[in-house]
Amino acid sequence: MSKEKIVLAYSGGLDTSIILKWLQTERNYDVVCFTADLGQGDEVEEARVKALNTGAVAAYALDLREEFVRDYVFPMMRSSALYEGYYLLGTSIARPLIAKKMVEIAEKEGAVAISHGATGKGNDQVRFEMSAYALKPDIVTVAPWRDWDFQGRADLEAFAREHGIPVPTTKKDPWSMDANMLHISYEGGPLEDPWTEPPTHMFKLTVNPEDAPSEAEYVEIEYVNGDPVSINGEQLSPAALLTKANEIAGRHGVGRIDLVENRFVGMKSRGVYETPGGTLLYHARRAVESLTLDREVLHQRDALGPKYAELVYNGFWFAPEREALQVYFDHVAKSVTGTARLKLYKGNCIVAGRKAERSLYDKDLVSFEAGGDYNQHDAGAFIKLNSLRMRVQKRVEDKGKK
C-alpha cells in the first residue's frame, strides 16, 4: 500500500532535515521537499540534493525572487505599512508566497498535507497555516514542533545521529536568523534580554554606521504608478532593483531596527532587523508621495496602513479584507510617479530632493509674494469657522462654572 504524501518547507538545515526524517519514521509519510529561493543567499540546489539524500521522494527548488518582490513586496509597500510603527514586515510578507507554492506542489504531487519548521510559540506557524487554509481549505497541516516529544536540542541531535543526519560540530551563533531579499531578522539567545545591545558582528547586510564611509552618497530613485523602476537612472527588474538598493543602503549602515513587538500568539518578543533596501525605498516613496498625493488621500492611506500591516503580520494575506484594502492602495498608488533624491550617511537616510511631473506642490501658491488663487484675507473667516465648535465648547464650560 502506497504512503500518503506530505510537502515540507525545507531549508536544508539540521532542524528541517530532522523533520523530514521524523515525518517518514513517526508519521509514515512520503515526504516531498520544497526550498524557496527568496534571495536569502543559501544554495537552494544544495538543499534540494540534500533533501533527496535524506530520504525525500521528490524535491523542488524554485527561484521566486522576481515573483516575491513584484507580487508581494512592492504591493505591500504601496500601503507604506509599518507594523507597530517600525517593522517593514520582511519575514511576514515571505510566508504567504511559500505557503502558496507548497499548496501548488501538494496539488501537483497528490499530497494530502503540508509541514513546516516553525515553532509553536511564533507567528510563522500562523502565517503558513492560515495561508494554506485560505488556498486549500481541506489541506492537513503538520507542525512537528507542536507535536513531537523531543525535550530539547540534545534529543534532536540524538535523533539525527540515529538516522544518519550530519550534526554540525562547529558552534552555531546563539541567535536565530531568517533571511530573504527584503531583510534579515535576528531573534533569541542574548537578544532575548531587551536591554542587551546586539553584537556588531551579528549583522550581515549593513556595515556598522561608525564604520560607514565618511563621505555621503546621493541616490535617485524613480517611481512609476507607486512602484520603483530605476535607481540612478538605471531601469531594473523588481528583484534586481531591491538587490541594488540593499547594496547601496547597506554600505552606509542604513536600515537597522531593534524593537520589542507584539506577536499575534499573545506574547512580546524582541527582534532585530536589517532592511537596508526596504528602508531606502520607504523614504523615497514617501518623498514622492508628498508631492503627488492629495492631503486627505494621503492621510486616509496612512490611517489604513497600520491595519494592513497588522493583517500581513498576523497571516491574513489571502483574507478578503487584505485584498479589499489592496484595491484601495493600488488605486492611490497610480498617482505616485516621480523621483526622490536621498542622501545616505552613517546610518542616516535623508531626503535631499523630490520632483514629479504631476506635482501638487505650487511654488507660486506658497510664496510670500502676493497673487495666485490664495487670498490671505480669506484666512480669517476660515479660522473663525473652524474654531466655532471650540468656541461653543468653551462658552458652555464657562457657563457651568457660574
From Swiss-Prot:
Major location (coarse): cytoplasm
GO cellular component, one term: cytoplasm
Quaternary structure note: Homotetramer.
EC numbers for this chain: 6.3.4.5
Catalytic reaction equation(s): L-citrulline + L-aspartate + ATP = 2-(N(omega)-L-arginino)succinate + AMP + diphosphate + H(+)
GO molecular function: argininosuccinate synthase activity; ATP binding
Disulfide bonds: none
Family: Belongs to the argininosuccinate synthase family. Type 1 subfamily.
One Pfam entry name: Arginosuc_synth
Record-linked SUPFAM superfamilies: Adenine nucleotide alpha hydrolases-like, Argininosuccinate synthetase, C-terminal domain
Annotated compartments: Cytoplasm
Binding-site list for L-aspartate: T119, N123, D124
UniProt entry keywords in alphabetical sequence: Amino-acid biosynthesis, Arginine biosynthesis, ATP-binding, Cytoplasm, Ligase, Nucleotide-binding
Annotated positions binding ATP: A9, Y10, S11, G12, G13, L14, D15, T16, S17, A36, G117
Stated name of the protein: Argininosuccinate synthase
Biological process according to GO: argininosuccinate metabolic process; L-arginine biosynthetic process; urea cycle
Pathway where this protein functions: Amino-acid biosynthesis; L-arginine biosynthesis; L-arginine from L-ornithine and carbamoyl phosphate: step 2/3
Taxonomic lineage of the native organism: Bacteria, Thermotogati, Deinococcota, Deinococci, Deinococcales
Amino-acid positions noted as binding L-citrulline in the UniProt annotation, renumbered to this chain: Y87, S92, N123, R127, S176, S185, E261, Y273
